[in-house]
Amino acid sequence: MTSDCSSTHCSPESCGTASGCAPASSCSVETACLPGTCATSRCQTPSFLSRSRGLTGCLLPCYFTGSCNSPCLVGNCAWCEDGVFTSNEKETMQFLNDRLASYLEKVRSLEETNAELESRIQEQCEQDIPMVCPDYQRYFNTIEDLQQKILCTKAENSRLAVQLDNCKLATDDFKSKYESELSLRQLLEADISSLHGILEELTLCKSDLEAHVESLKEDLLCLKKNHEEEVNLLREQLGDRLSVELDTAPTLDLNRVLDEMRCQCETVLANNRREAEEWLAVQTEELNQQQLSSAEQLQGCQMEILELKRTASALEIELQAQQSLTESLECTVAETEAQYSSQLAQIQCLIDNLENQLAEIRCDLERQNQEYQVLLDVKARLEGEINTYWGLLDSEDSRLSCSPCSTTCTSSNTCEPCSAYVICTVENCCL
C-alpha cells in the first residue's frame, strides 16, 4: 500500500463579508499520488463517499481518503459564520492531519522495505542451488555384502567352535578310555607278576619235593643195605646150628610199600604239576589274549589320538585363518564406518547450517510479524483518532446545520495521470 498524497489545496476564490452569500469557493483534493510525479495506476473512489450527510445550509469541507486514506481538510477558508470552529478544534484537526500524514509516510516506507526484502528473498531463492543428495546405494550394497560375509564368517566360526568342542570331548573320552585300559593293563601285569611268583614257588616246592624223594630213596637204599648186612651177619653167627621157626604173621614187603608210596607221591606230584601247568597255561593264554586286545585297543586309541591331533591342528590353522579374515573384515568395516561417519558429519554440519538459516528466517519472520502487529496497533489507534475526527466533524455538522448558507458540491472521479480528484464548490457562504 504505497501512498504519498500531496498537500490539500483549498482555493477560495472569494470570501465576502457582506450579509448575503459570498462568491463561490472551490476546494480541490488530489489523492493516491506518488511523490514528485503525481501519477499512479490506481484510481479509487473514496471509501466514505457512500456516507450520506443530510446538510441544510452550508456543506462541510469534503474528506477523501482514496487509496491512501488522506483526508482533504478545508480548515483555512474563512467561510464559516460566527467562528464555528474554535481554536482547540482546529488544532486537534491539524494534529490529526499531521499524525495521519506521518502514518501514511511510515506505511509507504514499510511497503518499500517489504518489496525490497521480497525481491532479495526471491533473488536468494533463485540463486540457491538445490542440494542433490549423493547416491550412497553402492556403499550400502558394499556394506550389506560385508555384513553378509561377516555373518557367514561368524556362522563358520561357530560351526568350527562346535566341531572343536566335539573333538575335545571325543579326545577326553578316548583319554579316559586309554587311562582305564592302562589301569587294566597294569592290573593284568600285576596279576601276571603274582602268577609268576606263584609259579616260581611251585617250581621251588617241586624241586624240594624231588630232593626229598631222592633223600627218601637214598635212606631206603641205606635201610635195605643195612638190613641185608644185619641179616647176613646174623645168619653167619647162627649158621646151621639153630633152626627156629616162628608161626607169626607174614612180614610186610617194605619195597612194595615204598613203591606204593612212591607211586602215590609221583601221582600226586604229576596231578599237581599237570593242574598247575594247565592253570598256568590257561591264565597265560587269557593274559596273552587280554594283552593282545589291550595292545590292539591301545594302538587304535593311539591312531585315533594322532588323527584327532592332526584334525585339531588343521582346525587350529583354519581358525587362525578365519580369525585373520575376521580381523581384516573388521578393519574394513571400521574404515567404512569412519568414512561414512565423516560424510555424515559433513551432512550434519550442512543440515545445521540450513537449520541456522531457517532459524534466522523464522526470527526475521517473527520480527516482521511483531512489526506488523505494532503497525496494526498503530492503525487501530489511528482509526480511533479518525473516528474522533469524524465525531468532531459530526458535531460541527450539527452546529452548522442552522447556518443560512446554501452550498453546492460537485464531485468528479476520473482516472487520469494525476489520480482521482474531487472538486467541492461552496456557494453563498455567509460570514
UniProtKB/Swiss-Prot annotation:
A GO molecular function held by the record: structural molecule activity
Residues flagged as site, Stutter: A338
Region named Coil 2: 253-396
Residue ranges, annotated region (Coil 1B): 136-236
GO cellular component: cytoskeleton; cytosol; intermediate filament
Region (Head): 1-89
Reported function: May play a role in late hair differentiation.
Protein's recorded name: Keratin, type I cytoskeletal 40
Species: Homo sapiens (Human)
